[in-house]
Amino acid sequence: MTALHRPAPTGAPVGRDRGGPLADHAEQFAKQLASATELGLIPDPDAVRAVWEDAAAPDWAGPALWLHGDLHPANVLTADGTFCGVIDFGDLFAGDPACDLAAPWVLLPDGAADHFYGAYRPAPDAATLRRARGWAVLRALVCILIGDAGVHGRPGGKPTWGPPAHVTLRRLVATAS
C-alpha cells in the first residue's frame, strides 16, 4: 500500500463514494446498522456505533493520494496463506488514505493491524487510523448485508462475504478505545 499511496496529479479521478470525508457516510452507516440489526445480524449495535463515533476524526488535510478503494477479501489474491496480488483496480482514484487503510481490519488476522500500520510509510497519524476504523466498519456492515442476502438467496448476495465481515466487526469492537 505504501507504493500505491502516492500524491495523485491534479485532475485525477475522485472516488464515487469512497476516499472523501467519512462524515459524508453517516446516513449510510445508520441505515446499514439498522438493517443489519433488524435482521438479527448485529448482537451489540451500541458497540458498533461507538466504533463509528470514535472514527469522527478530523478530515484528511494532506494531498489526495492514489487509492485502490475496494480492498476486501474478493479483491486480494493469496497463495499458501501469503498475499501475492491485488485485483480490481476499476475504482482507482485519489483521496484520503484512510479508505484503503481500513484493509488490515478486513483482511488480516487478529492482532495484525498494528503490525501493518507499523510498517506502512509514512506512518499514519492517529486521526487517519481512527478514520480507517470507520471505513472498516462501513465495509463490514456492507459485507454482512451482502453475505446475508447470499445466505437467503436474495439478488446480489454473496454468502461467503458474511463470515469475514463479522470477524472484522468483532475485531473493531474488541479493540475500541
What does each model-identified segment do?
Residues A64-L65, H72-R133:
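Active-site Asp-x-Gly
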Residues T2, R6, A34, E53, ...:
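Surface-exposed alpha-helical segments enriched in charged/polar residues
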Residues K31-L33, C84, D100, G150-G153:
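Short glycine/proline- and charge-enriched loop/turn segments
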Residues R6-T10, A57-W60, A149, S177:
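Generic structural signal for secondary-structure transition and capping sites
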Residues A103-S177:
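Helix-rich C-terminal or lid/interface subdomains of diverse kinases
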Residues Q28-F29, P97, V137-A140:
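N-terminal alpha-helical segment
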Residues G40-V51, A55-A56:
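Central P-loop NTPase core of STAND/AAA+ ATPases
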Residues M1-P45, A61-A64, L92-A94:
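A cross-family kinase active-site recognition segment
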